[in-house]
Structures are given as C-alpha cells and as structure tokens.
UniProtKB/Swiss-Prot annotation:
DNA-binding region, residue intervals: 37-56
GO molecular function, one term: DNA binding
DNA-binding listed as a keyword: yes
Family as reported in the entry's similarity comment: Belongs to the SorC transcriptional regulatory family.
Subunit structure of this chain's protein: Homotetramer.
Organism: Priestia megaterium (strain DSM 319 / IMG 1521) (Bacillus megaterium)
InterPro entries assigned: CggR_N, NagB/RpiA_transferase-like, SorC_transcr_regulators, Sugar-bd_dom_put, WH-like_DNA-bd_sf, WH_DNA-bd_sf
Role according to the record: In the absence of glucose, represses the transcription of the gapA operon, which encodes five key glycolytic enzymes.
Keywords carried by this UniProt record: DNA-binding, Repressor, Transcription, Transcription regulation
Record-given protein name: Central glycolytic genes regulator
Pfam families to which the protein is assigned, alphabetical: CggR_N (PF21715), Sugar-bind (PF04198)
C-alpha cells in the first residue's frame, strides 16, 4: 500500500490532497451529525463556496444525506469512511507516528487520530470515538468491569459511547472520587454516562477525590466504601486521562506547601493523583480514594487517552513508566513527542 501511495504522491499529488479533504469532511460529519453547512465550513476552515462543491460531490456519490436539520452520513458513507481510515493513516503519516511511539514507550498499542485538539475541539471527539472502539475490542472474558477517571477528554469518550457492546453485563465504575470540579467532568458522571449510552450498568463512589489522613482512614473503613474500592481495584480495564501538572494542581486547589513540592519537583504530568517529572519519576502524590499506580500492574488492560500538542510533556512523563498499556492520542501531541525524541 505504501509504495502505491508514494507513486500517487509523486505523480498525482493533488489526488491525495483532495482525498484528504473529503475524508476530513466525512469524518467531521460522522462526529457531529446532523450538522449544517455553515457550521461545517467554520469548523474545517473552508469557505462556504468550496464546501458547497464538495458537499454536492459527496451527495452525488450517495455518501451523505442532506436534511433541513443538517447533513448526515449514509450507510455507504459510513462504510467508505471505515475503509479509508487505514489508507489515510499511511497517507498522513499517522501510522509512522504510532509505530514510533509504540517502540519508544514499549506500549502494547498506540492509536493516533488526525488533528490537534488544542486547535480543533472536534479532535477530542475523534479521540473519544477511537477510545470507544478500543474498549469494545478488549471487553473479553473476565474484563467486564471498566474503571474510568474524570476530565474533559474522558467526557468526550463518554459522549461517543454507543449501545452495541457485545457484553451486556459490563459494569462501569469511577476510578476515584470526585475532584469537586464541573460535575460533567467528574468520574462518577462520566462512568454513569458511559453505562447509560452503552445500555450497561454502573456503580458510583461518593467520596471526595483528596482527603486528610484522618478522613481517609475513616472513610476507607466504611464497609460500603471498602466493598466499592475492592470492586474498583479489581476492574479488568482502566481508562484514564493525563493532565498537565500545574493545571491539575490548581484545579484541586492544592495547599501552598504541596504546590511548592510540585513546582520544585519540576512536575509536568499528572494521573491518578501522582505528579511526574520529565523523567517519569513521581515527585508528589495526593492521598486519593480509588485506584493507585500499583493497582495498574495487576493484569489489567490500561488505556490512556490524552491529546493536544500542549500535553506532550505530560504524556511523555506518564507513559515512561506505563509499559504495555495503550495510548490514544492525537497528531498534535504525537508530533511533539516524536520531535522531543529526535
């Protein structure tokens, strides 16, 4: 396939350019359908005149339908888009990025979606769609309990969840307590939404994300909390985000003394309440109720979802000690990561 693509790149470069543009249009319609032409043009940075001619072509090929409410993909469009994905990964260099990152971090799999979620918010939805696909593929045997963390990226994963899981007994649980942030970005809310959209089940953990030593000892001694923590820690799959260290510290309203530890330790990334420096070393840990780093080593399928070029350092910090896990990211972050290796 690669040799054919290289031939086309040399002899018919405009063909690949047109194909990429039409692929992106179909991709965005799939994510946001039904969507109007004006919104689509603005989102993709195209003029309405250019988009009008492309939409006319796609309609003539029976790839999209146009309704008063907006454009949607036809069944033919859905099938073509799925078939095009592998080709477009070769054309755009995403496959090479995936291979490079997989080898650099010793991961079991890397999925890179096109675009940069820092620049185009819809890319986060595409990461969400890729994450849902990854979750479904790996829900086998005893791995029917899925623990999920909070954050805007995981909220996008929940948004893209669909009701076609092959295992109706899947149970979604929060990986940890709430952050006290925007309710739709809390782990409890996200796990409930994933369960509802996939027509499966969920259980919630009603405790704050971080506690004093005394409060922590008191809460984890409660029988109901103890049972819930056992269920969470025994989950066969964990889906989590990766945050920028200072952003997460500020969001948690971290005490000044702990904030100094984060700063002095040169932390750049955060996950599960652990703060990591450039070398992937833990420089600070928040006492949280839920999954700890050691829990990830117990034969779990661990899926990290994070993107945006601004998060490259945070992703690198965490993934250096997350061998054999799965990374789902975007082109913006992937290119920054690879650039950092060179």
């Amino acid at each position: 396939m690669r040799s054919l693509i290289e031939v086309q790149r040399k002899l018919l470069p405009e063909l690949l350019s047109v194909m990429q543009k039409r692929y992106q249009i179909l991709q965005y319609i799939r994510l946001m359908q039904p969507i109007g032409r004006r919104n689509l043009a603005v989102s993709l940075g195209l003029t309405e005149r250019v988009l009008r001619s492309e939409v006319t072509f796609l309609k003539e090929q029976d790839l999209i339908d146009i309704y008063p409410s907006g454009m949607t993909l036809t069944n033919e469009g859905e099938l073509l888009l799925a078939e095009l994905e592998e080709v477009m990964k070769e054309v755009s260099g995403l496959r090479l990025l995936e291979t490079t990152l997989k080898e650099a971090f010793s991961l079991s799999e890397v999925v890179v979606v096109s675009g940069d979620s820092d620049q185009s918010p819809w890319v986060k939805n595409e990461m969400g769609r890729a994450s849902v696909s990854c979750i479904k593929e790996r829900l086998v045997g005893k791995k029917n309990t899925v623990a999920v963390t909070g954050g805007t990226t995981l909220a996008a994963v929940a948004e893209m969840m669909t009701p076609d899981l092959k295992h109706p007994d899947v149970l979604f649980v929060p990986a940890r307590g709430g952050l006290g942030e925007n309710v739709q970005n809390q782990a409890n809310t996200i796990c409930a939404k994933m369960a509802e959209k996939s027509m499966s089940h969920y259980r919630l953990l009603h405790v704050p994300d971080q506690l004093s030593d005394e409060a922590y000892r008191s809460i984890i001694g409660e029988p109901s909390i103890k049972d819930m923590l056992h269920l969470i820690k025994s989950a066969g799959m964990v889906v989590h985000g990766i945050g920028d260290a200072m952003t997460m510290a500020e969001r948690r309203k971290t005490p000044q003394a702990d904030l100094e530890k984060v700063k002095n330790g040169h932390a750049v990334g955060e996950a599960f309440g652990y703060y990591f420096n450039h070398q992937g070393e833990v420089v600070h840990k928040v006492k949280t109720v839920g999954i700890q780093l050691d829990d990830l080593k117990n034969n779990k399928c661990v899926i990290a979802v994070a993107g945006g070029s601004s998060k490259a350092k945070a992703i690198k910090a965490f993934m250096q000690q997350a061998h054999d896990s799965i990374l789902i990211t975007d082109e913006g972050a992937a290119k920054e990561l690879v650039r950092d290796f060179n």
